[in-house]
């Protein structure tokens, strides 16, 4: 979902399975009690990202719960010479996260996520490790339109707060997002989201933004689109996104493709995901 909407997800409350990667506190306002998901992304033809996650809301009212997430990122192969023979090695990094979320009031949810990261840059080097924290908050309210079924949300996340990895500071991120959900009928629904993110430290310091929309039609079909504004030298750059999906309860399948120039990191990037919710 988030990939088809230009990476927006800080305030989107209907995708609990992958919320740990954006803002785990949004799960507090999810309509589902639990869910699992898996996605595969091919980035710029040479990079690969795999993600798996789950969430579970505890108790009848589901006011609190936990979420788990795993991501594995591979870079292009490096042609190296070692022990008198050529070695093809792909640098990689993976992280494992566990988060806890809780509704502290009817309209406010908070979350805290602990993540363990491990990276390996060269075949003959030891892996480097570190830990970091993500903090999230979401404020959600219904609107006095569409029989009070419409709603709006504001989400905040402070991510990658932790120790250095192999002597390098983690790319910390401060994000603020908003979303409006408009269910016109049981079969037709529009959702619009906007995210603003500020990345630091100084080497990658810049502001990036994304705006995305999702339309559910005929109960099961989904189409998405969005545009991401960024810095080509310090981040993902400027690119558009298109996406589609099928929601046939309890199964959810999604596909997205990035529309980017050749000098953009997101050039020829696509993602395929599948999930199950209950």
Where are these regions (language model features)?
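Subset of outer-membrane beta-barrel
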Residues: 1-278
